[in-house]
Design a protein with these regions (language model features):
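Ser/Thr/Pro-rich, acidic low-complexity intrinsically disordered regulatory segments
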Residues: 1-23, 37-95
Length: 95
């Protein structure tokens, strides 16, 4: 059975395969990864709310980076880039 491709799988795979402890992407790169046919939504270019690390809004891109184990730490709307940091997993919680 073929695995279903989800909307944000491209960004999840890209960040997992190319990110270290931190990765910076331009809005153009995000366009190409997430929205190759339509581009980022206008709200992503106008407000930092679109970039919130929040699973409760599936229409936004958070699924992509959170599922990859990263969070947005910087959004620069003027220069059109985003910085993601790898989420730290604390082993002491499970000892």
């Amino acid at each position: 059975m073929k695995e279903r491709v989800k909307k944000y799988d491209a960004i999840t795979h890209y960040i997992k395969n190319n990110g270290g402890s931190q990765i910076t992407l331009t809005f153009t790169q995000m366009d190409e990864l997430l929205f190759p046919n339509s581009g980022l939504p206008k709200s992503a270019r106008q407000t930092t709310d679109w970039w919130a690390n929040d699973y409760r809004h599936p229409e936004k891109g958070a699924y992509g980076w959170l599922n990859a184990g990263y969070e947005v730490v910087v959004v620069n709307l003027a220069k059109e880039y985003i910085v993601f940091n790898q989420l730290v997993k604390s082993s002491w919680l499970f000892d």
